[in-house]
Amino acid sequence: IRDSYNLLQGKPELIEDSKTIDLEKDFVPTLINEKKSFWDEFNFGNIALTPLSFVYWSVSTFKNTFFKPKASNEGEVPVVVVGNVTVGGNGKTPLVSQIALDLKNLGFKPGIILRGYKGSFTGTKLVNDNTTAKEVGDEAIFHFNRGFNVVVDRDRARALSYLERNTDCNIVISDDGLQHTSLRRDFEIVVEDANRNFGNQLFLPAGPLRDNIWKTKKVDLFIY
């Protein structure tokens, strides 16, 4: 879409009586709104999926009740977790990158752990110059290109352990991971899209929630 947009903007001539279309402003938002509309309202589809949502809610509530994440012990690298209670891109990655940059400017040596969304690699991977986005996903490459040590692993606790053993990081930021109770943490940040809010406030798959809304009142910082 972006390439098409650039081509359109670079056209020297337009068909008579035609209207210039800005794909970024006119077309992309429409696609996003259509994708989200199902979770933004109540309809027959939502109602049909509520039994599955109840299962998801039960698992989430059970984990929040009986599996409390531990804080770092003395001598361990502190961990900051940035996540959200809804699915979708709500600005976690740019926020993580900015936090890491600010910490670096303050004299810290931040490292970043993440799942590696859409990457093909399975296991634990310390991103290096030869690592591709196809292996670890765009987000991991984005963080690495900004000068940070990055470890990709679906198991965030294992990623943290690997990062501690193989780098000189003295603080770690988890890009997503709020729901990973096995990952120790010392500071939790939840970021959500204020325009979208919490949609229809139903759990997956009937709605966008993957955690209880009250979780936003339990974390250290809620960015909304």
Name what the model sees in each region:
Residues 1-4:
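Conserved small/polar residues in nucleotide/adenosyl-binding loops
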Residues 31-78:
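A transmembrane-helix-recognition feature enriched in membrane-embedded lipid enzymes
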Residues 52, 111, 224:
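Residues lining hydrophobic/aromatic ligand-binding pockets adjacent to catalytic sites
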